[in-house]
Amino acid sequence: MPKYRSATTTHGRNMAGARALWRATGMTDADFGKPIIAVVNSFTQFVPGHVHLRDLGKLVAEQIEAAGGVAKEFNTIAVDDGIAMGHGGMLYSLPSRELIADSVEYMVNAHCADAMVCISNCDKITPGMLMASLRLNIPVIFVSGGPMEAGKTKLSDQIIKLDLVDAMIQGADPKVSDSQSDQVERSACPTCGSCSGMFTANSMNCLTEALGLSQPGNGSLLATHADRKQLFLNAGKRIVELTKRYYEQNDESALPRNIASKAAFENAMTLDIAMGGSTNTVLHLLAAAQEAEIDFTMSDIDKLSRKVPQLCKVAPSTQKYHMEDVHRAGGVIGILGELDRAGLLNRDVKNVLGLTLPQTLEQYDVMLTQDDSVKNMFRAGPAGIRTTQAFSQDCRWDSLDDDRANGCIRSLEHAYSKDGGLAVLYGNFAENGCIVKTAGVDDSILKFTGPAKVYESQDDAVDAILGGKVVAGDVVIIRYEGPKGGPGMQEMLYPTSFLKSMGLGKACALITDGRFSGGTSGLSIGHVSPEAASGGSIGLIEDGDLIAIDIPNRGIQLQVSDAELAARREAQEARGDKAWTPKNRERQVSFALRAYASLATSADKGAVRDKSKLGG
């Protein structure tokens, strides 16, 4: 029988000092012996996805205490990728994932907490907490802040839906008037919550459902809706049950590594491909799998991408649907239901509620359930009122979207495409693979060949795009922006958005060893591995070289002879300590970022730290 971790600090005469300090936090004699559960919050006023979380930790804590536990809350940092985008701030985004994971480990292990409720939401916070949870392997439940309502405004006498990406594109489009750009900016992000499309934050919150670590509805129920409160109340109660199951009944099925098994990771990736999730999810699932000591690699993702169809299409791949529409159609469970009926899921998995996949679908799939309260929950919709308050409205759709032929979520027979929304490409400058969000690529450019325009920083590429130096047919190469080379593997949302602003969204490709925002669409290929700074062949591409992209056949090729590439590599190596570094880039890199770069692996490994350099 495992001993409560917290007993280390609450029992024994030699722990009198620790108990004295616990008493100073409000604990009493009656609390010593109860499980201490960390409420891992991420409230900050910097991030709309987290601005409403201040009181939600207290909500969870009250339920923990009522159920017989002791709740202790702390906060992690949270970087807003949208605000950090397009300047030096983006260097810090991906490294913040490791800091979040480490800080959770530090707090939980330093204070010997027994379990956790993770209140996450945005891009690097959910992955960081997920990595920590699987590293620590103590009972955990995730409950996120929820998606933002889609923006809406009237243009040309028509009400249209908007999101953050629309504001970026229109802000750089010289054909858009100042007044229209201002109107879109003011309408794009109307409420608290994670940005309203299938961007990285919402993708990851959906994947925690598929991994079994959060409750049904977690990925899609709006931040503003009153129904979301129940997820927080349930999390506080349920975590005490899970904790007691493990520590008092020796039930290891309550642990995250047993819930988020390899079968669950395969299900999560299957969901990701089917819903056209952010390419960043590949990085984060690979990183989380390593923390769980699961053998889950790019090869596994490639195999899944070749057999899973696209069953859901959401912004930025279409402006017709946002997360509020996914929820109306049944949310994550609705997509999993269609995948299950197609025979594409591992059924022998359980979630934090203790339900198997078939049991979860029977109870929560809107196409199967007989429970009116579940159907009512999935009718929770937007209010269209600007607010930063959680649970501030209770509007409902008149009906569910259960149209699996033409609705937001499709059945296998009516799939958006037989190929899924993400694909892994391989070639002579991406030997370890690269990723493309096929859900956002127009059918006309699934095969594309063009001359390279090479840039060694995102900034130079942006200047070239806006300066008219990139023309239709070009393949924009942005290198030395990988985990080590950036450092920090910047997102390239501004370059891809500005290509659209300049009318080149369907006329150019962009390839990088950096990554993309979940808001990116178009022929945007990222995570090229190995990265340039690690000696990857992307560092050998020269202006004018022809690049051939073949998504249907999963290929990407630099059309230069092996002999020429060998000569270029020899010349690069001859630069000595300057080899595999940008030639004409001035960038101030802090000590903290240099420390990150010194241990960072390429994207095909999840951009995690290279443990071989640490020994032990």
From Swiss-Prot:
Pfam families: ILV_EDD_C, ILVD_EDD_N
Residues that, per the record, bind [2Fe-2S] cluster: C122, C195
Modified positions (N6-carboxylysine) in chain numbering: K124
Gene Ontology CC: one annotated term: cytosol
Positions annotated as active site in the UniProt record: S517
Pathway(s) served: Amino-acid biosynthesis; L-isoleucine biosynthesis; L-isoleucine from 2-oxobutanoate: step 3/4; Amino-acid biosynthesis; L-valine biosynthesis; L-valine from pyruvate: step 3/4
Signal peptide: none
Swiss-Prot/TrEMBL catalytic activity: (2R)-2,3-dihydroxy-3-methylbutanoate = 3-methyl-2-oxobutanoate + H2O; (2R,3R)-2,3-dihydroxy-3-methylpentanoate = (S)-3-methyl-2-oxopentanoate + H2O
Family affiliation: Belongs to the IlvD/Edd family.
NCBIfam families attached to this UniProt entry: ilvD, PRK12448.1
Name this protein carries in UniProt: Dihydroxy-acid dehydratase
Source species: Escherichia coli O7:K1 (strain IAI39 / ExPEC)
This protein's encoding gene: ilvD
